[in-house]
């Protein structure tokens, strides 16, 4: 049940650490590793706030005879050291995607390598398919952290080349298969404290509207309350620290924003994106708390960042987002950009007031001890000499110099 030319020699692997969710794919992989590689398997299940009971994953691993089982609560680390640094950059991939899956992979990979060192494992394995981005994200992270690590990627090795064959293998090996509310095999779902994504089945046709059953973390905007919810978010050096004046830990704060976003129909996205491997894919994403946080962070930046610093930061953001999407979290260029972004956030402290209403997040107020907004300069009333409007004449004259010279030379930018 392998493609021999791609399969690592069985004798080369003694113990492997598997990133294990307890779902169909990784449960099949667990059994496949045991039978194909005849090696000891260590399972690692990361609690990233996916909102599901993780003990079933432990029990499944025990059912397969796994002796070393790790179920680690990484929620605070995930938000503090991965999500918040990314949001300081306002990172958005292709103008829409808030990178909820992408940002989780380097942390999972990092902990896998730590567990491999701890248990003496000589290999790591993941459940990402050979068509997607996650295989790249996992493996780039593995190699950045442990260059000589052996990596097993079952989807690139076995002959279970479809979801149907996977289900057949599961049934033949008495592996429990989850069902959705309709009693069918579920969509391919990834979830953590930042977001959830759904792919596969009817979503593979980009012309088909998703059924409401696809959505797990948000109500529809149409079903949201007719009365707006007003909240405040406090920031310190670019990171959110409080909601409505109550200080919260990073994970608790994001969880609270998720609750607020869900209740107001915020954070749904139906997206066709360009994968790093070259193909387009369609997914349905729900990022309620992250959507609120992005709007709020831009709101506080609007009064605390210098214009040129803000514009430079915005110009760097697409590259930064692409690095995370493509799996280069541990790259020197990402760290370099992060240093510049973090430098820009030193003055990004203050409070943003927001209105949440039927899928919308609207900034309705912002204040900061570091505000660069000067009422006496911008007022339409008497500024008492704070700004001499005559100065604008020379400014415009200098700015227009190259345009006037081009016109004199007969090289007008457009026809008259």
Curated annotation (Swiss-Prot):
Catalysed reaction, written as an equation: L-citrulline + L-aspartate + ATP = 2-(N(omega)-L-arginino)succinate + AMP + diphosphate + H(+)
Domain of life: Bacteria
Major localization class: cytoplasm
Residues that hold L-citrulline according to the record: 97, 102, 133, 137, 188, 197, 273, 285
Enzyme class name: ligase
One GO cellular component, as annotated: cytoplasm
Segments passing through the bilayer: none
Location in or out of the cell: Cytoplasm
Span of the signal peptide: none
Keyword terms, alphabetized: Amino-acid biosynthesis, Arginine biosynthesis, ATP-binding, Cytoplasm, Ligase, Nucleotide-binding
Positions of L-aspartate binding: 129, 133-134
GO biological process: argininosuccinate metabolic process; L-arginine biosynthetic process; urea cycle
EC annotation from Swiss-Prot or TrEMBL: 6.3.4.5
Pfam family, one: Arginosuc_syn_C
Chain sites annotated for binding ATP: 19-27, 46, 127
Keyword Plastid: no
GO molecular function, one term: argininosuccinate synthase activity
Pathway connected to this protein: Amino-acid biosynthesis; L-arginine biosynthesis; L-arginine from L-ornithine and carbamoyl phosphate: step 2/3
Family: Belongs to the argininosuccinate synthase family. Type 1 subfamily.
Subunit structure: Homotetramer.
Name under which the protein is recorded: Argininosuccinate synthase
Gene designation: argG
């Amino acid at each position: 049940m392998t493609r021999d030319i791609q399969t690592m020699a069985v004798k080369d692997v003694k113990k492997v650490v598997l990133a294990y969710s307890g779902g169909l794919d990784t449960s099949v992989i667990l059994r496949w590793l045991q039978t194909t590689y005849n090696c000891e398997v260590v399972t690692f299940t990361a609690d990233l706030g996916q909102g599901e009971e993780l003990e079933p994953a432990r029990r499944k691993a025990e059912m397969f005879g796994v002796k070393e089982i790790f179920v680690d609560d990484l929620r605070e680390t995930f938000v503090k050291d991965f999500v918040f640094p990314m949001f300081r950059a306002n990172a958005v991939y292709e103008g829409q995607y808030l990178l909820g899956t992408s940002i989780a992979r380097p942390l999972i990979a990092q902990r896998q390598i730590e567990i491999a060192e701890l248990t003496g494992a000589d290999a790591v394995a993941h459940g990402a398919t050979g068509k997607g981005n996650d295989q790249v994200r996992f493996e780039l992270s593995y190699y950045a952290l442990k260059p000589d690590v052996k990596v097993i990627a079952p989807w690139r090795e076995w002959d279970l080349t479809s979801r149907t064959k996977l289900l057949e293998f599961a049934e033949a090996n008495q592996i429990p298969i989850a069902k959705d509310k309709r009693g069918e095999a579920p969509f391919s779902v990834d979830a953590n404290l930042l977001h959830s994504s759904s792919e596969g089945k009817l979503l593979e046709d980009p012309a088909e509207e998703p059924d409401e059953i696809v959505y797990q973390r948000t109500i529809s905007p149409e079903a949201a309350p007719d009365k707006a919810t007003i909240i405040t978010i406090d920031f310190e050096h670019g990171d959110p620290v409080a909601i409505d004046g109550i200080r919260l830990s990073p994970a608790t704060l994001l969880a609270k924003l998720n609750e607020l976003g869900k209740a107001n129909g915020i954070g749904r996205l139906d997206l066709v994106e360009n994968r790093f491997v070259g193909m387009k894919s369609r997914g349905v994403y729900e990022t309620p708390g992250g959507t609120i946080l992005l709007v709020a962070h831009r709101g506080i930046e609007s009064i605390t960042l210098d214009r040129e610093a803000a514009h430079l930061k915005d110009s760097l953001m697409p590259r930064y987002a692409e690095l995370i999407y493509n799996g280069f979290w541990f790259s020197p260029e990402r760290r370099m950009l992060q240093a510049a972004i973090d430098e820009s956030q030193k003055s990004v402290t203050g409070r943003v007031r927001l209105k949440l209403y039927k899928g919308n997040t609207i900034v309705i107020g912002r204040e900061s001890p570091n505000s660069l907004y000067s009422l006496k300069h911008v007022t339409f009333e008497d500024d008492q000499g704070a700004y001499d409007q005559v100065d604008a004449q020379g400014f415009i004259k200098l700015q227009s110099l190259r345009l006037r010279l081009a016109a004199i030379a007969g090289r007008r930018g457009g026809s008259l």
